[in-house]
Each structure stands twice: as structure tokens, then as C-alpha cells.
A protein has these predicted regions:
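Primarily recognizes the serine-hydrolase "nucleophile elbow" in alpha/beta-hydrolase
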Residues: 96-164, 172-177
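Conserved alpha/beta-hydrolase "acid-adjacent" motif
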Residues: 201-210
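Short amphipathic alpha-helix adjacent to the substrate-entry channel of hydrolases
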Residues: 46-64
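Short beta-strand element of the alpha/beta-hydrolase
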Residues: 29-38
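Catalytic nucleophile-loop/oxyanion-hole region of alpha/beta-hydrolase
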Residues: 45, 64-113, 251
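C-terminal catalytic histidine-bearing segment of alpha/beta-hydrolase fold enzymes
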Residues: 74-76, 216-271
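Short beta-strand/loop motif that positions the catalytic acidic residue
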Residues: 188, 193-196, 200
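N-terminal cap/lid segment of alpha/beta-hydrolase-fold proteins
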Residues: 1-28, 88, 162
Length: 271
């Protein structure tokens, strides 16, 4: 395995690339998944980072995790009445530059430049979907080939996750429409897999429904999976990544295989 760390502006990219071998295929070019943990733009959750990368490594994907710019506050201390440093557009620029980095280093990273997926959890899902909607601002080399959104923050409207939206755009009312990503899906938005749970009380599942509907209206290939059970922030749903105060949720543990099926169908092959 090739493991390396790269600075993308103020963000840190941790790369996990599978080695190629003569007795398998020394020239294999794999699909690449870049993972963006959640954390409400307060922090980047470690529960949605390395363990996820290693899970998809085991399925044949090269992976990386981007620890993007956040406010570095405890979510329990967040208050809507406080003023915070506005993050936008720094995380979005970091994301675009990450795709550009991977695409420009494809030979070194044993990667197919036309099979780059961005995968985001919660607020990381908002970050990912924002590039899916707006990648044209950053150029063709920043275009993701597919997206995976896990219990994503999508809207700044009725079902908004207030903390995430506030920390991203602050009090700037002019940016509220921009932050409602369901309004900006187009036929240029890449194929997307979305999953969430009906019991999510932090980021209502309606966020996912809004985005799926927008994808449908624009004829973008997508798959939406809504699990009946499970709270917010499940990650892989295994004991390894489950908080000590929450139960393991076996019902959602099949999602990596479902994502794999979607990506193989989208790319026609994993290699």
C-alpha cells in the first residue's frame, strides 16, 4: 500500500492507495474514492474517515480522506446567537483542488482519472453535493465522476441542519439560496448514490428526498436508499465506529456493497 499525506491549502489529504503486483496486474488503474467526513463544519469526524477508506480499499478502490477546513468548535457549545468565522468558500475550494490533485497524479496513484468518486457524510455530504452542483466554477479537471452522499445536509430551507449552514455561510442571507443545493442540480451533476435513515433526528431524511427529486427532474442517474432504523452519524454501522452510548445497527451494514454495485454499474468496471 502507498500511504502519504498531502497539504491541500490548509486541508490535509491522507491517501491510501493499493499496490499493484506482477502476479495480478502491475498496470492496474483503479477507481478512486475521496472521503469527506461529517461534523457539522465544527470538526471532521474520525468515525467517518480511515475505517471507511480501509473498507473500500478491501473492495478494490484507492481511497483518500480530506480533513477540510472547519471551525474547530465543540458541537455541544454551538449557539445560533453567536458569531463564527464564515467558512465559505474555503472548504469548496479545497475539495475542488483535491480532485485536481488526484487527477493530476493518477499515474503515481495507480488511478483511472475518469473514475473519481467523492463521498461525503452529513456536512461532508453538503460539501460534496456543492461541488456536484458547482464544479463548473473550478474547471473540467475538478469534475467528480460520481458522488455518494451519506445522510447528507442538503438544504438551507425548512429541513436545514442549522449548525452546518450557519457555520458555512454565517449571517449572509445572499448565500442562503446557494446553500440550498437541491435548487442547483443540473444535467451536469454527476451520478449520485444517497442513503439516509427515517429515524435521523439531526439531519431529517427530507434533505435526501429533496436532492433525489432534483436529480430525477434533471435526468441524472441516482439511487436513493432510506433505511427504516438508525440515528444520525452511523458511519459503517459496525462496533468499530459506533459511539459507546449508541447501539450497533446491523440493518445498515450492507450499504458499502450497495455503493459498490452502483459505482461498478456507473463506471462499467472497478478497474
Amino acid at each position: 500500500m502507498i500511504y502519504k499525506e498531502v497539504q491541500i491549502g490548509e486541508a490535509l489529504l491522507r491517501i491510501y492507495v493499493l499496490s499493484n503486483y506482477e502476479d495480478i496486474d502491475i498496470n492496474r488503474k483503479r477507481a478512486f474514492i475521496i472521503i469527506y467526513p461529517g461534523g457539522a463544519y465544527c470538526r471532521c469526524s474520525n468515525r467517518e474517515a480511515e475505517t471507511v477508506a480501509i473498507k473500500f480499499n478491501a473492495m478494490g478502490y484507492n481511497c483518500a480522506v480530506l480533513f477540510y477546513s472547519v471551525n474547530n468548535i465543540d458541537k455541544t457549545e454551538y449557539s445560533p446567537s453567536k458569531q463564527y468565522k464564515t467558512l465559505y468558500p474555503k472548504p469548496q475550494i479545497e475539495l475542488a483542488n483535491t480532485i485536481k490533485y488526484v487527477r493530476s497524479h493518477c499515474e503515481e496513484l495507480n488511478t483511472d482519472p475518469n473514475k473519481i468518486t467523492i463521498m461525503g457524510f452529513s456536512a461532508g455530504g453538503h460539501l460534496v453535493a456543492s461541488l456536484g452542483d458547482y464544479w463548473m466554477k473550478y474547471g473540467e479537471d475538478a469534475k467528480p465522476n460520481a458522488m455518494v452522499l451519506w445522510y447528507p445536509v442538503i438544504t438551507s430551507g425548512q429541513y436545514a441542519h442549522e449548525c452546518s449552514i450557519h457555520l458555512l455561510i454565517g449571517e449572509d442571507k445572499a448565500l442562503m439560496d446557494m446553500a440550498s443545493l437541491e435548487k442547483h442540480v443540473s444535467q451536469q451533476t454527476p451520478p449520485t448514490y444517497i442513503w439516509t435513515t427515517k429515524e435521523d433526528q439531526a439531519v431529517p431524511y427530507e434533505n435526501s428526498l429533496l436532492y433525489a427529486d432534483a436529480l430525477s427532474q434533471n435526468n441524472v442517474p441516482f439511487c436513493l436508499k432510506v433505511y427504516e432504523k438508525g440515528c444520525h452519524g452511523l458511519s459503517l454501522g459496525t462496533q468499530e465506529v459506533t459511539e459507546s452510548t449508541k447501539p450497533v445497527v446491523p440493518e445498515i451494514q450492507d450499504w458499502p456493497e450497495l455503493v459498490d454495485e452502483f459505482l461498478v454499474k456507473t463506471f462499467r468496471t472497478r478497474f
